């Protein structure tokens, strides 16, 4: 997601390279012996409620990733420890590559950037958390240097580049166990919000298939790793409906996996109703049956809609053995317009997580690190403190 962020003119690329210079040669002690073969139900239960380390490793300056360029400080182990202590079991780490990808034909990813990604992964992985890493801003039309475009005429070049980048990333992490999950992409679509173009959707499906095949062929634990793939723009309706989504085949996975079990997960995001969750104004500040002011409550997207959306993912995928990860959900702070807003944000968060648990989905809260008006943050990343304990409590209550 890049819908809500604040950019500040602070630490530049020189600072990033100073920070990452010490990470060269960073390695992990993970081994193939660590890999557990979990069923869909088991891994969903273990992943619990998740949290996004948003607007950091996907943040960019003119197409070059820079983790502090959107106003957040350098990521520290202390932040991750605080997130774990709050009760979260999974951390999703959005990652952009963009200008850190070299030229054809090798498309070599900058080594210092890979080292930094690995170090941040290890902050969470070494705490016993589940970790999800993806390819995030590379597919956003609005990001300078983005290239993973379903509506581009240059699909052969895109697919070759995509395959080679994921090959490098997967190889780097091939020894990590089942607690590391790769996600093929983020909110990829053609840039307009009409129904999906069938041809473009076919390109998205091709990316997902390339991703699965490439990761599996890198060996190590990757032939049995859980892999996460989205449909069009991570939209639930466009993923479950008759719009063209195809679950990738998994022909190169380990033969040790029981044939009745899957190792593919499906990704979707939930920000409905958007006028409550994301619009940066004070028009809609309340949500749900307990709203006290009908004029401040959206005319759609309430409890019944939430239930029907998550049930559709359950019916389409969970019943067939595919875990579903709601990789982003949340609502921005509008308390400057309505002092009761944070209470309704908590009501919303609890409803989303409780409904996810009801339908055996994994809910992952979107935190962009920004506190205050229009921010999604639950934590202050500068001093590693909790800023929205009521929303965290609501999330954890929803998972009970």
Curated annotation (Swiss-Prot):
PROSITE patterns given in the database record: GLYCOSYL_HYDROL_F5
InterPro entries: Glyco_hydro_5 (IPR001547), Glyco_hydro_5_CS (IPR018087), Glycoside_hydrolase_SF (IPR017853), Glycosyl_hydrolase_5 (IPR050386)
Superkingdom in the source lineage: Bacteria
Reported function: Endoglucanase with high activity on carboxymethylcellulose (CMC) and lichenan, but not active on Avicel.
Regulation affecting activity: Strongly inhibited by Hg(2+), Ag(+) and Fe(3+). To a lesser extent, is also inhibited by Pb(2+), Mn(2+), Sn(2+) and Cu(2+). By contrast, Ni(2+), Zn(2+), Co(2+), Ba(2+) and NH(4)(+) do not affect enzyme activity, while 10 mM Ca(2+), and Mg(2+) produce a stimulating effect. Is also strongly inhibited by chemicals such as N-bromosuccinimide and dimethyl(2-dihydroxy-5-nitrobenzyl)sulphonium bromide. Is not affected by N-acetylimidazole.
Active site per UniProt: 187, 328
Subcellular location: Secreted
Claim: Membrane is one of the keywords in the record: no
GO cellular component: cell surface; extracellular region
Name of the molecule in the record: Endoglucanase A
Keywords: Carbohydrate metabolism, Cellulose degradation, Glycosidase, Hydrolase, Polysaccharide degradation, Secreted, Signal
Record's keyword annotation contains Hydrolase: yes
Coiled-coil stretches noted in the UniProt entry, renumbered to this chain: none
Practical applications according to UniProt: Study of the performance of endoglucanase A on paper manufacture from agricultural fibers shows that treatment with the enzyme improves the properties of the pulp and the quality of paper. CelA treatment enhances the physical properties (stretch and tensile index) of paper from wheat straw, while dewatering properties are slightly diminished.
GO BP, sorted A to Z: cellulose catabolic process
GO MF annotations, alphabetized: beta-glucosidase activity; cellulase activity
Family from the record: Belongs to the glycosyl hydrolase 5 (cellulase A) family.
């Amino acid at each position: 997601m890049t819908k809500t962020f604040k950019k500040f003119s602070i630490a530049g690329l020189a600072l990033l390279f100073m920070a990452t210079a010490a990470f060269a040669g960073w390695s992990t002690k993970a081994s193939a012996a660590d890999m557990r073969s979990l069923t869909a139900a088991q891994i969903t239960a273990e992943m619990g409620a998740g949290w996004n380390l948003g607007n950091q490793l996907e943040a960019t300056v003119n197409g070059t990733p820079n983790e502090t360029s959107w106003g957040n400080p350098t990521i520290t182990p202390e932040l991750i420890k605080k997130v774990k202590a709050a009760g979260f079991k999974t951390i999703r780490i959005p990652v952009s590559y963009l200008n850190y990808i070299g030229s054809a034909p090798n498309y070599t990813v900058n080594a210092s950037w890979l080292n930094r990604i690995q170090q941040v992964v290890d902050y969470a992985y070494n705490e016993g958390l589940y970790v999800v890493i993806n390819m995030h801003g590379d597919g956003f039309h609005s990001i300078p240097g983005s290239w993973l475009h379903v509506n581009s005429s240059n699909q052969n070049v895109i697919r070759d580049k995509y395959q080679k980048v994921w090959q490098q990333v997967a190889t780097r992490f091939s020894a990590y166990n089942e607690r590391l999950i790769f996600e093929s992409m983020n909110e990829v679509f053609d840039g307009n919000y009409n129904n999906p173009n069938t041809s473009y959707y076919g390109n998205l499906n091709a990316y997902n298939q390339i991703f699965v095949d490439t990761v599996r062929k890198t060996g190590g634990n990757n032939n049995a790793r859980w892999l996460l793939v989205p449909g069009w723009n991570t939209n639930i309706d466009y993923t479950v409906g008759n719009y063209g989504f195809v679950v990738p085949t998994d022909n190169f996975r380990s033969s040790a996996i029981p044939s009745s079990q899957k190792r593919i997960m499906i990704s979707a995001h939930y920000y409905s109703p958007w006028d409550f969750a994301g619009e940066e104004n004070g028009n809609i500040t309340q949500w749900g049956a307990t709203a006290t002011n009908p004029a401040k409550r959206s005319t759609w997207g309430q409890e019944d809609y939430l239930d029907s959306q998550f049930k559709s993912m359950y019916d389409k995928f969970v019943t067939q053995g595919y875990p579903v990860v709601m990789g982003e959900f949340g609502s921005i702070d509008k308390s400057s317009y309505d002092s009761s807003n944070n209470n309704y944000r908590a009501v919303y968060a609890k409803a989303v997580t409780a409904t996810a648990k009801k339908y055996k989905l994994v809910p992952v809260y979107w935190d962009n690190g920004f506190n205050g008006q229009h921010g999604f943050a639950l934590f202050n990343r500068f001093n590693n403190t909790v800023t929205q304990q009521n929303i965290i409590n609501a999330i954890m209550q929803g998972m009970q």
